[in-house]
């Protein structure tokens, strides 16, 4: 999860988030190299006589500054398209969870089970226990099995919402009348926090998301106790 004064991304917990982190570093390095080159040329022009006021045509230079940006864009686009395809592809999910956004809470339905559904509200600050996180804890966590592909079907009952869990690389819009989907896969057990990431009204900041990823055996025991 995030912590105060954090500069980088949250620790990756899913394969998708690991890919996104690597792509971020890849793109950031390209931006850094381009910025360094531009600043170097500007400094040379300001401190030396590196100017050609009489040059009217330079075919070689024009060719270079046309081809080079195209190559750079390809180096960015190819890994981006690969990750986009990975995020969209869902192969044989073991579980499907339907998520509905409301003003201002989330409701969840495990479609593979009968009568396994609940609402998830933020716990008010006055009701928090020692060690719990303000504005991030909920009364009913979403319990899911780890290391298995899970499909989330996401929509909304009223206005636009966005279901986001940064450490899993998830951010999917919840749109009334439309069903979006996302893949959830966690490499390790634990609690993973998120929030609504679309301004949806006065209590927008009070719509936390808590995923509890557990081994399959514990998930089966939990689901049996909930039915």
UniProtKB/Swiss-Prot annotation:
Which residues are recorded with the post-translational modification Phosphotyrosine?
218
Gene Ontology cellular-component annotations = mitochondrial inner membrane; mitochondrial membrane; mitochondrion; respiratory chain complex IV
Q: What is its EC number?
A: 7.1.1.9
Q: Which UniProt keywords apply?
A: Copper, Electron transport, Magnesium, Membrane, Metal-binding, Mitochondrion, Mitochondrion inner membrane, Phosphoprotein, Respiratory chain, Translocase, Transmembrane, Transmembrane helix, Transport
Q: Which residues lie on this side of the membrane: Mitochondrial matrix?
A: 46-59
Q: Which GO terms describe its molecular function?
A: copper ion binding; cytochrome-c oxidase activity
**Which positions in this protein are listed as binding Cu cation A1?**
161, 196, 200, 207
Which superkingdom?
Eukaryota
Q: How does it sit in the membrane?
A: Multi-pass membrane protein
According to its UniProt record, which cofactors does this protein need?
Cu cation
The GO annotation for biological process reads:
ATP synthesis coupled electron transport; lactation; positive regulation of vasoconstriction; response to ethanol; response to hypoxia
Where are the bilayer-spanning segments? 15-45, 60-87
Quote the record's binding site residues for Cu cation A2: 196, 198, 200, 204
Catalytic reactions of this protein: 4 Fe(II)-[cytochrome c] + O2 + 8 H(+)(in) = 4 Fe(III)-[cytochrome c] + 2 H2O + 4 H(+)(out)
Q: Where in the cell is it found?
A: Mitochondrion inner membrane
One short Pfam name that applies is COX2_TM
Q: Which InterPro entries match?
A: CcO_II, CcO_II-like_C, CcO_II_C, Copper_CuA, Cupredoxin, Cyt_c_oxidase_su2, Cyt_c_oxidase_su2_TM_dom, Cyt_c_oxidase_su2_TM_sf
Membrane-side (Mitochondrial intermembrane) residue stretches: 1-14, 88-227
Q: Which SUPFAM superfamilies match?
A: Cupredoxins (SSF49503), Cytochrome c oxidase subunit II-like, transmembrane region (SSF81464)
- Quaternary organization: Component of the cytochrome c oxidase (complex IV, CIV), a multisubunit enzyme composed of 14 subunits. The complex is composed of a catalytic core of 3 subunits MT-CO1, MT-CO2 and MT-CO3, encoded in the mitochondrial DNA, and 11 supernumerary subunits COX4I, COX5A, COX5B, COX6A, COX6B, COX6C, COX7A, COX7B, COX7C, COX8 and NDUFA4, which are encoded in the nuclear genome.
Q: What does this protein do?
A: Component of the cytochrome c oxidase, the last enzyme in the mitochondrial electron transport chain which drives oxidative phosphorylation. The respiratory chain contains 3 multisubunit complexes succinate dehydrogenase (complex II, CII), ubiquinol-cytochrome c oxidoreductase (cytochrome b-c1 complex, complex III, CIII) and cytochrome c oxidase (complex IV, CIV), that cooperate to transfer electrons derived from NADH and succinate to molecular oxygen, creating an electrochemical gradient over the inner membrane that drives transmembrane transport and the ATP synthase.
Q: What is this protein called?
A: Cytochrome c oxidase subunit 2
Provide the species name: Rattus norvegicus
